[in-house]
Amino acid sequence: MRALAHAAAAALVALALAAALALLGNALTRAGVAHQGEQAWADWRAARSPWRWTLRQPRDVVASRAFGPGRVSAGTDALTVAFAGGALQLGLRLARPASLRQAPLLALHLTRSQALPLSIIVRRTLAAPACVAAAGRLPATAATLRIDLAALRWRCADAPAVMPVRAAMLRLQIAGPAGARIALREAALLPAAPVALTAPLSWSAWRAAAPAMGSVPVVWLPARFSSRLLAQRDALWRRDPAAVALPAGVMPHAPAAPATMPWDWIVIALCALLMLLAWRAPRHLTQRPAWLLQALAAMLPVLLVAFGIGDSQTPDLRSGTLITLALGYALLLTLHEDAALRPWHWLGAWRAAWLPLLPAVLASVLWLLQARHAPQPADFARYLPWAALQQFLVLVVVARRLDAALDRRAATVLAAATLFALGHAPNTALMLLAFAAGLWWAWWFLRRGALLPVVLAHALAGTLLQAIASDSGWLRSLAVGARYLGSGG
């Protein structure tokens, strides 16, 4: 009877945690969309647009390289482009479609330049034919060049055309002789005249209204579930890429000024200090408190990334530092592991090794019901190392220490599953799937101590879920962090 009561209590706690995770994922997504909208609103009011590029590293352009004969490299304060003879293309990254109707001026700031022929290449959608326009020549010396895209002679699919009003792809095509070099520091799309912003419109009012040619609509998105909210935002941008998207009820205002203190780095330094203290804890604490402190220290980088510390559309030095801290600390604990901890191994008894596959079986059922495409072996191979790192950190490093420190198996399973789910924030649907699978995998691992069956099951389930992800579906993608907030349109 007591065992039944404990199981019922654990089930209630699991349901409460799942509800809390859903609320958290939705709240983080709402905050991210609000920040995007506030920044876009402030840009339009300041006679700028949301499409600006700071170019310093190869990663600042599409594919981190030049398309064609040449290469890009990091300069001191600009992106250096070296020509190998012929025309090359530089792709400007678009986190959302660009509105050339509202921002038809292209500004290029060059710190080193030569009078080389320049063309602009645009695709309305990624599947649409390319539209090309000759834009004259770059300046002979360092300067800021402004190009009125609407005044250029455009050709789309080899036929004369007017300027595309939206861009899902935007490239610069520059022809230069071998040995020529330029340095491009910044690029931006700018409005030709001050832009009027509407008062916030409800979703239904915006859908019923005719597109306003001379103003930028500010639209409230009513959805609450994260994937649905992002799908509405993308639908808004497909109709009007210039539109400002805000969660319902959020009044537009300029975002707060960036902090003058490097708070992200201060938090990361405190995280590293806690890890150091936890590493030295066994010298000053008894086993159980030391194990608990080590588990909490290993969890901290995952929690910081989940809540947006050091995360961005392109992973930067902060997120890389947190990931390195987590993996380095996990490796350190493993190499100098307390012999009193319960041992783990890669393989266990084969008769029980199939049990971790149950979440993958459920994922295969979902795939059969709503497959978008067939999963490929290469997808599984790419996912496998990431699955191994996650499960090693959650199960081998954290769960075993929590289990030994708390001596409460149900609490350990719930904590490990929650950590696994938080690592997938703010993707609400993926957080809930990870929590459910994490409960099963943590329970099985703590009973059997074998890691490889869980890793394989995780990689298989992730590969199948990737094959059903859809920008407009309940599972938008397997992306996490700020990358989840990227445009699907």
Regions found by a protein language model. Give the residues of each.
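Alpha-helical transmembrane segments
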Residues: 9-18, 239-241, 267-272, 290-304, ...
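Function-critical hydrophobic alpha-helical transmembrane segments in multi-pass membrane proteins
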Residues: 326-332, 352-422
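Beta-rich carbohydrate-recognition modules and glycan-binding surfaces
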Residues: 2-260
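Functionally important transmembrane alpha-helices
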Residues: 429-489
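Aromatic-anchored segments of alpha-helical transmembrane domains
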Residues: 298-308, 360-369, 417-425, 459-469
